[in-house]
Amino acid sequence: MPKRTDLKSILIIGAGPIVIGQACEFDYSGAQACKALREEGYKVILVNSNPATIMTDPEMADVTYIEPIMWQTVEKIIAKERPDAILPTMGGQTALNCALDLARNGVLAKYNVELIGATEDAIDKAEDRGRFKEAMEKIGLSCPKSFVCHTMNEALAAQEQVGFPTLIRPSFTMGGSGGGIAYNKDEFLAICERGFDASPTHELLIEQSVLGWKEYEMEVVRDKNDNCIIICSIENFDPMGVHTGDSITVAPAQTLTDKEYQIMRNASLAVLREIGVDTGGSNVQFAVNPENGEMIVIEMNPRVSRSSALASKATGFPIAKVAAKLAVGFTLDELRNDITGGRTPASFEPSIDYVVTKIPRFAFEKFPAADDRLTTQMKSVGEVMAMGRTIQESFQKALRGLETGLCGFNPRSSDKAEIRRELANPGPERMLFVADAFRAGFTLEEIHEICAIDPWFLAQIEDLMKEEKAVSDGVLSDLDYAALRRLKRKGFSDKRIAQLLDVKEKEVREHRYVLNLHPVYKRVDTCAAEFATETAYLYSTYEEECEARPSDRKKVMILGGGPNRIGQGIEFDYCCVHAALALRESGFETIMVNCNPETVSTDFDTSDRLYFEPLTLEDVLEIVRTENPWGVIVHYGGQTPLKLANALVENGVNIIGTSADSIDAAEDRERFQKVLNDLGLRQPPNRIAHNEEEALVKAEEIGYPLVVRPSYVLGGRAMQIVHSAEQLQKYMREAVQVSEDSPVLLDFFLNNAIEVDVDCVSDGKDVVIGGIMQHVEQAGIHSGDSGCSLPPYSLSEEIQDEIRRQTKAMAYALGVVGLMNVQFAVQDGVVFVLEVNPRASRTVPFVSKATGVPLAKVGARCMAGISLKEQGVEKEVVPDFYAVKEAVFPFIKFPGVDTILGPEMRSTGEVMGVGASFGEAYYKAQLGAGERLNPTGKIFLSVREEDKERVIKTAKNFQALGYGICATRGTAQYLTEHGLIVQTINKVPEGRPHIGDALKNGEIALVVNTVSSDPQSVSDSHIIRQSALQQRVPQYTTTAGGEAMSEGAKSRDHLGVYSVQELHGRLKNRS
């Protein structure tokens, strides 16, 4: 059956901001779906609140709305655009829940819109824990013993039936939000309370624990004629009890017999049929008891998921693209497989002749108070994938791709008690402690007994440890061609071999080159080399035949950003994708190097050639040797490729764009100071210190408060504001080992200054400003965590012109070719330069969406020698509307972590709001970030002494909107003196009823809480912020944020929806 002709336009719902449990894999699937449906002639309408996505580029859909993903907003878009159908399976849990809300609130019926890809009933049956269990029993598959509960009494009764440890799973959530494993009654009550809050239907599944069972996933695609194929099987290295998003996973499954695999395959197809997923991709999770082989179904997702992005990258089969086409009526046998150039139909099950390993990336260093033990609630922020011909090779490649300083199984501890603890209670580095256990003399049986990891995986690591021991007992010259090749085939990096031999990495590399030992590159082709493939999707391995077949065209190689993490996220991937697209359009052959399976950059048709490899010097140099590119771009992948810049230049690689020396001039304090002095620009007073005594002496010279940080950081890692010599001493003792042979930087902190971000692009001759963004939060909050407005909402034209002049002067002085980002602080009308980054910044996608100028593309062409004039980019575009970017935080996943913002970045994602006024844009950005302001209730204010004057306007704005105002004693007294009617409310230590009670009783609509720097007032008010977080009450830890929300709330009853195409069209007509 060919495609449906009764549908003309289709609305795709995106996944919104990047949060833990839902990352950029949905940008990848949504972008594929847009392309697939437009290819077939459908009009595609897209809604997604995240500006840092490729799918929200104006070219991806016919009409694009960067608006909050909530049913009320989507209804306005439906009323305006009148789509025939909605495809809700491309945007993760957010899109599914939004689609169900549209159905429940009668919107789909009112406008006669059909759900395609998954019916309301199928979504409900898969996501509703009780219905799912009934469905499984009906087809003879068992689930863990479990009970669906809607009240705490029901939950307690269910727990008695299933016993401890007990698993708690909320309905309709993703990333295991709100769930957990309870080992006693107190834990059980706490997790249930959290779970009821997290579930939109106030429903929990109380389930028997299958801790220690083996976990598997099947990625399945089905069409309307009931053709079903398995894309790939995935096995978890970690047994049940760790969320699959936090587990190391391996594809294809390694420890199933063929018979077991066939049983699981048949079961997964039966699950899809019973749930009613008629078309598209789904993933089904199983647990197998290692004692007797008993198999149970854990859950299924009736949509493309994190696992399907992994399966797509692991096999080369574009699940999201195929699922989108199946949703409009195609069948699998009618679709061709792109990767084989159409030689095979999409109904061929992929077959793979290599092993894929995925390892999650965590960011616990950003949340020291968080519990870093892994359970059923997901905590990782990114992931890395590697391919090899053996499990050992792909595992070790994945470890070095993580960029946590590993180059293999680096030792972590030799203390047997600590090793035992780490094996028994999984944390982010359990696999390293397995290796340590073998080093410390544990037997395979003992290790298996403690951690329940399958003995087959343990045997692989044991073998690697024997190899390590043999290497460290010898010297480099012992490693002849055969010996070194054996190590390389098992995935050992030059750097790890160097550590074992106590020599430099360079010596091992030179020795290997003398032996003429190099990797070859194999192709990912979905068919285990049965058919020839034109698609250059490659991974390295140490074998005989190389399948790279490089061309002799003029090539540019783009180094990607590696795994997502806080401080380096999807924004950098966005820039890499744009570089590849722009340079392809300009006639270059583009080569992408990256190892992040969630991203658009690792899609095989984004660039001409894709190398799925770790971003280490060894791996990059080998690709350069094979491809011999004309130029390499290191400026677009964040800190990851920048760290390689100098070493690449030393090895004769041509880095195009801003030179490595200029990057160093901007990053190196002393050199940068000289640049600013020569230009006559101001910096906050600053000093450099190499040790504690020097720091204390220099701090006295400048005066407190100070911002202290190590040099060369991204995301404000280990950056703090200190107010006294005691705090500085503590910082120097606890945080200073952050960067090797790098001193600590001390800057005078500009209190209550306005921070400003500027992105610009230069071709070496001309400089064009991309956008000037005024931060909402004052200087001292990391720029990645601050809301910002383009154009500025309160900076005078004179100040903006001065900022433009200074930006251009620095771009010329540093010899920038490509993109540059500058952060300024404005205090009492004086402009200070805080820092300059001559590279792509995280605001580039936002600026591009707000102005219609694709900065990353323009910058990439500049690097390749195409001038701004030739590109027709000669003047700054200032929008005639407001665009506001807001950060999204993962605090709800880390109970106990304080929500106070500071100079260390902690947000995982961002949203954008657009409006005719700053207030409207800011309010929509807050909605996009998940903040919901109740239309009634009280506004609670509790601010430090210096903020009291600033909070008067906020109180007046909210009072005018009909809210009551309540405040703690000092703030209430101050506001009353200034003519406001305020109810005084107790702080928690002052006795009951206190603010914690008012929050729990649902009396408070919004919290503004700022604290002075002394630890006592921070800990006294911690409970206010925690209660607000748990009750989902919007809270602001800066007066600026509270004031902006009070302005925004004025326009909440008349919010418009604006498409990117109509906004950009307006700007083009104006110019």
From Swiss-Prot:
Mg(2+) 3 binds at Q823, E835. Residues 1-403 are annotated as: Carboxyphosphate synthetic domain. The keyword Transmembrane helix does not apply. Pfam families: CPSase_L_D2, CPSase_L_D3, MGS. Keywords: Amino-acid biosynthesis, Arginine biosynthesis, ATP-binding, Ligase, Magnesium, Manganese, Metal-binding, Nucleotide-binding, Pyrimidine biosynthesis, Repeat. Its EC number is 6.3.4.16, 6.3.5.5. Binds 4 Mg(2+) or Mn(2+) ions per subunit. Mn(2+) 3 binds at Q823, E835. NCBIfam families: CPSaseII_lrg (TIGR01369), PRK05294.1 (NF003671), PRK12815.1 (NF009455). This is Carbamoyl phosphate synthase large chain. It comes from Neisseria meningitidis serogroup A / serotype 4A (strain DSM 15465 / Z2491).
